[in-house]
A protein has these predicted regions:
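Residues that scaffold, gate, or flank divalent-cation-dependent active/transport sites
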Residues: 1-153, 160-161, 165-175
Length: 177
């Protein structure tokens, strides 16, 4: 009789946007950033949208013109609530924006840098290798893996969730992602 296997799936949040935020020493969770080539038309597809910018109703694969439209719409609403209906400045940080209604929502457009994303992906893969043998790591994409942890749970005396969280924390501590 075959024993059931245990797998974990790790999908890094808004990976390209997170890399671009870390490269700018910014918080990937609070920085409004899209990865897109602004030299193309506004119809270009964004390769990634940061979590804080998604809160304005954007999908992860929005077109640049949609980002512009959604942010403009959100700014129109904010302006009504701003003192004297005038913005004092702008910010691309969701924490600052939440604290100060007189700030205009801004965002960073980061041109794609695939080679840099591959470097981060390699660093992250090497972190997985600290815990798991390569034959048990199944790469799905640049930022997603499925890992067979069946034989590691007793070794580490952890649940699958605990092992996943240990690896994720190591990734965060090492890369900021």
């Amino acid at each position: 009789m075959n024993k059931c296997k245990t797998y974990i799936a790790i999908d890094l949040k808004s990976f390209y946007a997170s890399v671009e935020c870390r490269e700018r020493s910014r918080d990937p969770l609070t920085t409004n950033l899209v990865v897109a080539d602004p030299s193309r038309t506004e119809k270009t597809i964004c390769l990634a949208v940061s979590p804080s910018l998604k809160k304005y109703g954007l999908s992860g694969r929005a077109r640049l013109f949609e980002v512009i439209q959604k942010v403009n719409a959100a700014n129109n609403i904010r302006k009504l609530k701003a003192p004297n209906h005038v913005f004092s400045s702008s910010s691309d940080d969701s924490t600052e924006l939440q604290k100060n209604p007189s700030l205009k929502i801004d965002y960073i457009i980061a041109p794609p840098r695939m080679a840099r994303y591959m470097e981060y992906s390699t660093k992250i893969y090497n972190i997985y290798l600290k815990y798991i043998a390569p034959e048990d790591i199944h790469i799905y994409s640049i930022d997603e893996v499925f890992i067979d942890v069946t034989h590691y749970l007793s070794t580490y005396n952890m649940t699958a969730r605990e092992l996943a969280m240990t690896m994720i924390q190591d990734i965060l501590d090492t890369t900021g992602i």
